[in-house]
Amino acid sequence: MEGQRVEVDGGIMEGGGQILRVSTALSCLLGLPLRVQKIRAGRSTPGLRPQHLSGLEMVRDLCGGHLEGAEIGSTEITFTPEKIRGGVHTADTKTAGSVCLLMQVSMPCVLFAASPSELRLKGGTNAEMAPQIDYTMMVFKPIAEKFGFTFNCDIKTRGYYPKGGGEVIVRVSPVKRLDPINLTDRGSVTKIYGRAFVAGVLPLKVAKDMAAAAVRCIRKEIRDLYVSIQPVQEARDQAFGNGSGIIIVAETSTGCLFAGSSLGKRGVNADKVGIEAAEMLLANLRHGGTVDEYLQDQLIIFMALANGISRIKTGSVTLHTQTAIHFAEQLAKAKFTVKKSEEEEDATKDTYVIECEGIGMANPHL
């Protein structure tokens, strides 16, 4: 598909891997030849890292495209996409690079493949600077499926920083079109639940301490709901290396989902990890939006592709979300508006409505 190359400045706005994920996925979907320059230009280690490289190679393989300049440390790539193919595709970061970020770049593409896809993704399942796989399963999946597609995700092995070694298998069936979504009614919080985990040599007491500290923190603000956080010792044969962490999810009467999460680090008290996750959840419940700060940017590409007008209500719009909107407008020509929420209960809050007129992308194979 040789045509006019679309030029993307990889150094603007969020200036990191997200620009690559959004622009290469849209390039693949829309058949747009792409050049991305100044990749991660402002980062302490500029250029492609292993997880970005494996994401790029995966998109190339999904469509049998042509990729140049793709090596560790490279600050410029060119990508020429071809037709999206279903079937089995493997990506391995060979590090603790996040499998969830690999999913972010590949999922929109395979929805428009000719046949079902199986994505074998290897790396970190519960990694820093990325959604944990539990977030992807507990929050992203049920909300993203409102766009009218389904996927399942089988966690074979969990992998942690610094070794990685995790593997998930994602199965996705293609769709003709994506439905628009309207998530503007928050409802009231009806359930709070979660899991605190330890893996490898770490004792279960660490998970129990994280869970107990999180519950105490939430109770100070939300007194009338039972908070159920399960402490879990990951099975030895299903986890590689040592790790710990927690995710807590709040569900509302209208089916909205919010989360707070945190990972354990050497030398950091378990209580502190639990409290950090609890405080993140509480902050995400205060703004009155229908999605948390980590879901908002993940929905933008689907809103851009959907057949109709989508609306989501958010707290303050993150830089990641602003970046995703910028590139969805530049590449897909979707039209977004971001307005302060005009509802009375939001008057004193930092609450916004993101609206998008999607392009109604149709799967040419179905």
From Swiss-Prot:
Keyword Ubl conjugation (UniProt): no
Fetch the InterPro entries from UniProt.
RNA3'-term_phos_cycl_insert (IPR013791), RNA3'_phos_cyclase_dom (IPR023797), RNA3'_phos_cyclase_dom_sf (IPR037136), RNA3'_term_phos_cyc (IPR000228), RNA3'_term_phos_cyc_type_1 (IPR017770), RNA3'_term_phos_cycl-like_CS (IPR020719), RNA3'P_cycl/enolpyr_Trfase_a/b (IPR013792), RPTC_insert (IPR036553)
The record's annotation in CDD domains points to:
RNA_Cyclase_Class_II
Q: Catalytic positions?
A: 320
- Superkingdom is Eukaryota
* EC category: ligase
Arranged from A to Z, the UniProt key words for this protein are: ATP-binding, Ligase, Nucleotide-binding, Nucleus
Tissues and organs where the protein is expressed, per its UniProt entry? Detected in retinal ganglion cells (RGCs) (at protein level).
Which family does the record assign?
Belongs to the RNA 3'-terminal cyclase family. Type 1 subfamily.
Q: What is this protein called?
A: RNA 3'-terminal phosphate cyclase
Upper classification of the source organism reads:
Eukaryota, Metazoa, Chordata, Craniata, Vertebrata
Could you tell me the gene encoding this protein?
Answer: RtcA
